[in-house]
């Protein structure tokens, strides 16, 4: 790669990240424009930006498209993300998380313990479910508990956000940053637990969650009242089983095929499509309702990830 081109690409990447930080609500535009700039430079440089000899068997736009769509963009990660989003949406629809939270509150000897259990559960769910969705599930429980016991809800909500964001980085399927990291560090699902014989990211994140639980317990320990909430009715446990199968399947696939191929993505996306089929047939949802669920998935992050893959790959 030409030395000057390297600096141009580095400058594009730095400006992109800076603008994403400043204008988070327009991050898709920032990454898309940066990716487009890199693609144009790649075409003009005829392989100088997009590394490798991919321009040998093909020429011009065909070679550029081949390299971008088959090498730079990590379709395995994208399929994992889409499939896990579908399963997460169905998991929330099932009301299982809310039911578990109700049970934790019921068995807690005091409000302080109940708060800690809710925060810990929020973190655990965020390990495998996108953190915004997790907070949307747990926030009503936290607000109802705060109102009933006349607690200030702000520290509780801050705790939910912190635990959710922290645990979102613990595994491959937790959050997009973990997926970007896994793509370029060549981490499999299991590598987040044990990497080259050493404990990995997951366990360090759990240490952080433990410290967070201790901190918030000190904050809420004076709340001695016995907490209670209205029990939720579970719609179905099938989404929970899909989630557990996804976790177990990813672990097995990572053990059998350490390299990041397409097997993990196809597996998770297949489970997600199976979940949609269950949602349509077993839950008797109309095509419009199924489409609404799909439409509400975080497609903006998919576009964001594609832009990141192109720019970082350059």
Stretches found by the model and what they are:
Residues 58-154, 300, 304-314:
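Membrane-embedded alpha-helical segments and adjacent helix-loop junctions characteristic
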Residues 18-25, 121-130, 161-173:
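Transmembrane alpha-helix interface/packing and boundary motifs in multi-pass membrane proteins
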Residues 33, 37-53, 59-60, 70-71, ...:
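Membrane-interfacial helix-loop connectors
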Residues 118, 245-314:
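Transmembrane helical segments that form the transport core of multi-pass membrane transport proteins
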Residues 6-11, 29-33, 78, 112-120, ...:
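Hydrophobic alpha-helical transmembrane segments
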Residues 23, 151-154, 158, 169-173, ...:
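Juxtamembrane and boundary regions of transmembrane helices in multi-pass small-molecule transporters
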Residues 20-30, 147-155, 282:
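Membrane-helix interface "capping/anchor" motifs
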Residues 73-83, 164, 195-212, 260-271:
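Alpha-helical transmembrane segments
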């Amino acid at each position: 790669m030409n030395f000057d081109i390297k600096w141009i690409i580095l400058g594009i990447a730095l400006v992109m990240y800076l603008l994403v930080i400043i204008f988070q609500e327009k991050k898709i535009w920032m990454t898309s424009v940066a990716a487009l700039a890199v693609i144009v430079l790649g075409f003009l440089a005829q392989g100088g930006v997009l590394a490798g000899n991919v321009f040998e068997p093909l020429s011009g736009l065909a070679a550029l498209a081949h390299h971008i769509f088959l090498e730079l963009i990590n379709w395995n990660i994208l399929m994992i993300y889409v499939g896990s989003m579908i399963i997460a949406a169905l998991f929330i629809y099932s009301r299982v998380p809310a039911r578990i939270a109700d049970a934790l509150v019921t068995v807690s000897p005091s409000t302080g313990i109940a708060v800690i259990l809710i925060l810990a559960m929020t973190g655990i769910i965020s390990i495998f479910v996108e953190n915004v969705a997790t907070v949307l599930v747990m926030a009503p429980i936290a607000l109802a508990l705060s109102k009933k016991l006349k607690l200030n809800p702000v520290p509780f909500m801050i705790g939910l956000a912190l635990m959710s964001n922290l645990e979102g980085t613990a595994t491959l399927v937790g959050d997009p940053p973990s997926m970007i990291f896994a793509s370029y560090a060549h981490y499999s699902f299991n590598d987040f637990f044990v990497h080259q014989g050493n404990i990995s990211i997951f366990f360090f994140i759990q240490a952080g969650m433990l410290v967070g639980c201790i901190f918030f317990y000190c904050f809420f320990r004076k709340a001695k009242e016995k907490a209670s909430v209205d029990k939720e009715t579970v719609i179905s446990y099938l989404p929970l089983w899909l989630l557990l199968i996804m976790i177990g399947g990813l672990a097995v696939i990572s053990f059998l095929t350490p390299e990041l191929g397409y097997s993990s993505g196809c597996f998770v996306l297949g489970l997600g499509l199976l979940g949609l089929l269950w949602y349509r047939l077993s839950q008797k949802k109309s095509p419009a309702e199924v489409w609404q669920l799909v439409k509400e998935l975080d497609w903006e992050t998919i576009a964001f990830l594609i832009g990141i893959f192109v720019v970082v790959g350059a």
